[in-house]
UniProtKB/Swiss-Prot annotation:
It is found in: Cytoplasm. The keyword Acetylation does not apply. Residues 57-76 are annotated as: Disordered. This is UPF0291 protein GK1331. Keywords: Cytoplasm. Pfam families: DUF896. The lineage of its organism: Bacteria, Bacillati, Bacillota, Bacilli, Bacillales.
């Protein structure tokens, strides 16, 4: 995930935006940090999904075909 100091800075800029407003440089920094956060979140979510197997109540593997193909591409 994203470094703690970057998350703290995102929160700090968000609070400042609500109270006093942001300068152009701060708005640019906030947008950049948010893009980094979203990118890191998506990567973590994708990595997590590549470890998932869906099993129905009968014990059958019902993992979606698209996910199985993605898992095969990633691990082979």
């Amino acid at each position: 995930m994203l470094a703690k100091h970057k998350l703290a800075r995102i929160n700090e800029l968000a609070k400042k935006a609500k109270t006093a407003g942001l300068s152009a440089e701060e708005a640019f920094e906030q947008a950049k940090l948010r893009r980094e956060y979203i990118q890191a979140f998506r990567k973590a979510m994708t990595d997590m999904l590549h470890t998932v197997t869906v099993i129905d109540p009968s014990g059958n593997d019902v993992t979606p075909k698209k996910l199985k193909e993605s898992q095969r591409r990633r691990f082979h």
